[in-house]
Amino acid sequence: SEMCIRDRLNPIWYILNANMPEGMKEKEMIDLLLKRFIKDYDKTKNPEVRTRYGVFAGIVGIICNLILFLAKIIAGVLTASVSIMADAVNNLSDAGSSIVTLIGFKLAGKPADYEHPYGHGRIEYISGFIVSGAIIIMGFELLTTSFRKILHPTPLEVSVSSLIILVLSILMKMWMAKFNKYLGNKVDSAAMKATATDSLSDCVATSVVLIGVLLTLFSDINIDGIAGVVVAVFVILAGFGAAKDTLQPLLGQPPTKEFVQELENIVLQDKHIIGVHDLIVHNYGPGRVYASLHAEVPANMDMMEAHDYIDMAERRVEKRMKCFISIHMDPVVTDDEVINHLRKMTIAVVKSVGEELDIHDFRTVKGPYITNLIFDVLVPYNYHLSDDEIKKQIQKKITEKQSECRAVINIDKSYTG
């Protein structure tokens, strides 16, 4: 149908559907390049291999963008098109961004030292943010130039060679978007994903320039300045999107649900560990993840024996997930009927206040007249009740059920999203 043809000609549609069967040839070609130029290319968890990926992607980006810059600047001068020349300068900035990415990967691959005991992995995020900043600045420069062209339009001299250059540029940027997205997913690189976003915006931008040139060729309509504005807006939006993606790991974001589930499953694989909570994950760059959690063990277990089980759990996590972890041992009374009854009652009360709420670190302190139930309540972020309201409701309901009990509550937040 006409809609189907139009969709397939759309570069955004083409790139976003890179996982379709017809895109397999491109992936196979990229894998062949990786196999040819990157030693041990399949060992993507190895920091040295990740550095090789970054260097390779940077070199490819520099070469491709310099070729596009030279071709477009010639076409822009010949046609007197501000949008083509703006697109050329955009490619030159992309070449500079590739250099920044390359340097970032080299620095991020440096081993840990006295001043940086957690390594240099976050430099990769910083380089990605620099790339994003360069994209945004270039976008505003293009916007200024394009507005001037709208106010003071000049005639265009369209040639077949300029059209060919623009079409080939779109095709090359399509491939570069796929290339960087594929590599970024393989090694989980924010910098490469930012570069892929930039290439995608370049596809859209050059497509708009091409449409403007074609309109000039087949009619008297000159939308060169307007096309330049559209290009600039696409570039600016792409820059802000890439900046957001690279800032999130720097500011601190929760681990994925898959990561949390896998880690908890590995720890709970030992039947002597009966629960886990207070998981905190720190990301110091790809391949540099540090975690800590509290593991619950029966209080009547021998302390040295429990310590051995905790040590073995730490080694399992470090071996399988390449994650440095420190586990705190929490003793839990499991063989006292009174405490078990009070724990079940407390859980039921907390769930009646909010199904999303949960408890941990439950213990009791019995006095001559009052028994204190001491526990933490895990509350989601942006919960509809305030911390004080949650405490008051739980304390009131517990006292109503067990008049001799008082709830001593600590509100806790999840660090895993």
Label the model's feature ranges.
Residues 14, 19-54, 245-417:
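Peripheral (non-transmembrane) domains and long loops of multi-pass membrane proteins
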